[in-house]
Amino acid sequence: ARGKLVQVDLARYGIGELKPLRLGGYNSGLGFTTHPVMELFFNGEPMTLARWPNEGFVQVVDVPVKDGHTIHGLEGSKTGRLIYEGERPARWKDEPAVLLYGYWFFGWADSYERVASIDTEKREFVLEEPYAGYGYRAGAPYYALNLLSEIDMPGEWYLDRAAGILYFYPPADLSEAAVELSVIDFPFVQADNVSHTSFRGLVWELGGANGVEIRGGSQCLIAGCTVRRGGGDGIVVAGGNSHTLLGCDVYSMGRGGLLVSGGDRK
């Protein structure tokens, strides 16, 4: 990546204090919920937060704390300490916010885990609490991300949140490109107990959270709208009655498209 990396001082563009990166997942101790997240887009396509390996996963070698944790006969550990293989993680020892993404116990329960420290002698990751809900097992697939030292492929990027500097390895010529960063960390529409309100023909994009939230209320209409390039769910309707979603396009969202719930569950 030498000579191909570009950097941007976000303060020059009015982007000030940056919140810590917080990611969850189904198995996360932080809860299965949308955590607003910044994303970088190049000509409308999401870029990759710098990671290793560049594709696929590596496996946990062992879980050193044998605390007797067992689920359905599968042995693991509730303690966030993981043995890794090889020398690569030694490069990350001074990185400020290393994350590991993996399926730590079951192949359907994912989470992002923050690394508190790396013991290069023991080849051990020490994770921050709260730990993954189901715990951890040897052989679990994972990859590391949010690593400045691992920008080595076109499309990878990293944000130094303390300095406000964004680093990017562009996948093509920047001169004619649209490079966009999603910075809004709340829904574009939050309608709580709102009734008889319509939204027509609007485009909501480049948000880090859910796009539109309607909670309670009645007879709200969202028609012919577009929700795209966001970090959470596109449109959330929770409770209320007689709401209508009509002819909307929802795509390129980080979590899901439409999430509709309600009714009498008794």
Which residues fall in each region the model found?
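Hydrophobic, small-residue-rich alpha-helical packing segments that form membrane-like cores
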Residues: V236-K266
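Extracellular polysaccharide-degrading/modifying enzymes targeting complex plant/algal/animal polysaccharides
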Residues: A1-G216, L221, R228, G234-V236
